[in-house]
Amino acid sequence: MNIEKNSILNIHLNPEGILRIVLNNPKSHNTLSEKMILSLQQSLDDAASDEKVRVVIIAAEGSTFSAGHDLKEMKAGRLDPDKGKSYFNKIMSQCSTLMQAIVTNPKPIIAEVNGT
């Protein structure tokens, strides 16, 4: 796994086996959009099965680690005919799966959070 950059995550594995996953949407304070959740989930799944990865560090660009769920995306979901019920069920299920991937991952996962 080398340096990988996309609009949501920057990922880099150094020679010592330290995988840095950097949330890269500082304009939205790194909100947990559906794309962010799915990208993180895939990255953690990949790390779990990669023998070169010894530890995972999740960091963030900008002054905010993450502001939580993307409220603009959630508001848009309410426009669906079911008033957002299926969207909310889907996004909460995806988020729950992501959190379980963090808890059950065989690699240690560290959150690098700015303390100011």
Question: How should these model regions be labeled?
Answer:
Residues 96-116:
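Glycine-rich beta-to-alpha active-site loop
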Residues 1-61, 100:
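Conserved CoA-thioester-binding segment of acyl-CoA-metabolizing enzymes
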